[in-house]
UniProtKB/Swiss-Prot annotation:
Classification via InterPro entries: PurM-like_C_dom (IPR010918), PurM-like_C_sf (IPR036676), PurM-like_N (IPR016188), PurM-like_N_sf (IPR036921), PurM_cligase (IPR004733)
Pathway it works in: Purine metabolism; IMP biosynthesis via de novo pathway; 5-amino-1-(5-phospho-D-ribosyl)imidazole from N(2)-formyl-N(1)-(5-phospho-D-ribosyl)glycinamide: step 2/2
EC code: 6.3.3.1
GO terms of molecular function: ATP binding; phosphoribosylamine-glycine ligase activity; phosphoribosylformylglycinamidine cyclo-ligase activity
Transmembrane is among the record's keywords: no
Catalyzed reaction equations: 2-formamido-N(1)-(5-O-phospho-beta-D-ribosyl)acetamidine + ATP = 5-amino-1-(5-phospho-beta-D-ribosyl)imidazole + ADP + phosphate + H(+)
UniProt-listed SUPFAM superfamilies: PurM C-terminal domain-like, PurM N-terminal domain-like
Keyword Nucleotide-binding: yes
Similarity section: Belongs to the AIR synthase family.
Any one annotated GO CC term: cytosol
Protein name: Phosphoribosylformylglycinamidine cyclo-ligase
Length: 344
């Protein structure tokens, strides 16, 4: 038996560092506040009232991470935008059902807390929340010695939104003849990064190598685009039948999630050009066209189905919101034995 008096810090957990982190992020968190949020940071639970404008409010929840994009961010020591990625992955899933994000919580876990790194990450989370109009109401910072390699950390996000019951977008309104509009992505977003890292490995490429005047690292770590405000505006002013968020599974798996069983999406491949980074990945990794569309968004972050009569208005609204938007295809009747997504 040792006579040495042990403390939690001796075991690798620095409560002082955790408190310092909270102080560092308070201002960033405060900027995300909504009038419905009651109280501040530090409570055992976060309180949030429902916005009074909703007659029959339905809560919509989601949780996500950023996959192995985090590995790339850690290796390249770029921590300031991965938080935006985390928020985007959650709120973009909520908006496809027409939900306005209300509040967000994060989970940050590491072996030894580096306050500078954690503060940078959480500032990015707060910025993503500001862009989404949702409040960062709390989170968990877990310092767990022996659980992670030195310098590593993990992230998860949790978001709750609200939608009027009569205005839920679930794809049931999709009809043959509907038009499909694409919203451009900012890059690979937060999907396909295990394949991206494999391509970097087998090609021997250096992340500092330039592509179209920018280092590959900038292309790969470009933060995921947040579509909340532009899509909320679109929903208010047009009749939207379905929205698909192109994440893991790409075109082949995400678009069918919002289509009735008797319909298919016919995508016109000539309607857009892949951003250069996707051509680079396909060439350097010798990746098939099918695999590209299954793994990556290939420049398309969202696909929106709406009646043909709404197209002109929708494109104008989206352009005003700063989105790159175009007609990418249409909805047709699904024949026997056909796939629900055709890319022609």
């Amino acid at each position: 038996m040792s006579n040495t008096q042990l403390s939690y810090k001796d075991a690798g957990v620095d409560i002082h560092a955790g408190n310092e982190l909270v102080e560092r992020i308070k201002g960033d968190v405060k900027r995300t506040n909504r009038s419905e949020v009651m109280g501040g940071l530090g409570g055992f639970g976060a309180l949030c009232a429902l916005p009074t404008k909703y007659k029959e409010p339905i809560l919509v929840s989601g949780t996500d991470g950023v996959g192995t994009k985090l590995r790339l961010a850690i290796d390249l020591k770029k921590h300031d935008t991965i938080g935006q990625d985390l928020v985007a992955m959650c709120v973009n899933d909520l908006i496809v059902q027409g939900a306005e994000p209300l509040f967000f919580l994060d989970y940050y876990a590491t072996g030894k807390l580096d306050v500078d790194v954690a503060a940078s990450v959480i500032k990015g989370i707060a910025y993503g929340c500001e862009m989404s109009g949702c409040a960062l109401v709390g989170g968990e910072t877990a310092e767990m010695p022996g659980m992670y390699h030195e310098g590593d950390y993990d992230l998860a996000g949790f978001c709750v939104g609200v939608v009027e019951k009569s205005e839920i977008i679930d794809g049931t309104a999709v009809k043959t003849g509907d038009t499909l509009i694409a919203l451009g992505s900012s890059g690979a977003h937060s999907n396909g990064y295990s394949l991206i890292r494999k391509v970097l490995e087998v090609s021997g490429a250096n992340p500092a190598d330039l592509l179209e005047g920018k280092p590959l690292s900038e292309h790969f770590l470009a933060p995921t685009k947040i579509y909340v405000k532009s899509i909320l505006q679109l929903i208010k002013q047009t009749e939207v039948h379905a929205i698909a968020h192109l994440t893991g599974g790409g075109f082949w798996e995400n678009i069918p999630r919002v289509l009735p069983d008797n319909t298919k999406a016919v995508i016109d491949e000539s309607s857009w050009q892949w951003p250069a980074i996707f051509n680079w990945l396909q060439e350097k990794g010798n990746i098939s066209r099918y695999e590209m569309y299954r793994t990556f968004n290939c420049g398309v972050g969202m696909v929106i189905a709406l009646p043909e009569k709404e197209v002109e208005t929708a494109l104008a609204l989206l352009e005003q919101s700063g989105e790159k938007a175009w007609v990418i295809g249409k909805i047709e009747h699904l024949g026997e034995g056909e796939a629900q997504v055709e890319i022609q």
